[in-house]
Design a protein with these regions (language model features):
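Serine-dependent amide/ester hydrolase catalytic core
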Residues: 1-65, 118-123
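Structural helix-boundary/capping segments
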Residues: 9, 68-124
Length: 124
């Protein structure tokens, strides 16, 4: 794909515009400071010999809309599922970074969901 192709650039701008308007509408119409959603699904074990090709992962990212819009998002630890970490993401309007950081920090302090990983030795 040619990244300078006018059709591609137009589609990119259209996707950004639609994403921005949908996020703005959701925040304004519902009088929200932020949208909170689970981050990607739980972490997965990686094949230590062959690496990770991502084929074992089945999830839809909650951060896609904010990323396409160019809007801020922050993810913090939310806990563990089957011993694997999961996160929670906060998305906001354009230039709402200070508010999102404050919300994410308050969530972290209240839940204390983060814990140091338990490292195990791996035999070759």
């Amino acid at each position: 794909t040619n990244l300078n192709d006018p059709a591609y650039l137009e589609a990119l701008q259209q996707a950004k515009s639609i994403s921005q308007s949908r996020l703005d509408e959701a925040l304004t119409d519902n009088q929200l400071d932020a949208i909170v959603a689970p981050s990607n699904g739980p972490g997965w074990l990686i094949d230590l010999e062959n690496g990770d090709d991502g084929s074992s992962v089945n999830y839809v990212s909650s951060s896609g809309l904010a990323a396409i819009a160019g809007y801020p998002a922050i993810t913090v630890p939310a806990g563990y599922i089957d011993g694997m970490p999961v996160g929670i993401s906060f998305f906001g309007a354009a230039f709402s970074e200070p508010q999102l950081i404050a919300l994410a920090f308050a969530y972290e302090q209240r839940t204390q969901a983060r814990r140091a990983p338990e490292l195990t030795s791996v035999s070759p």
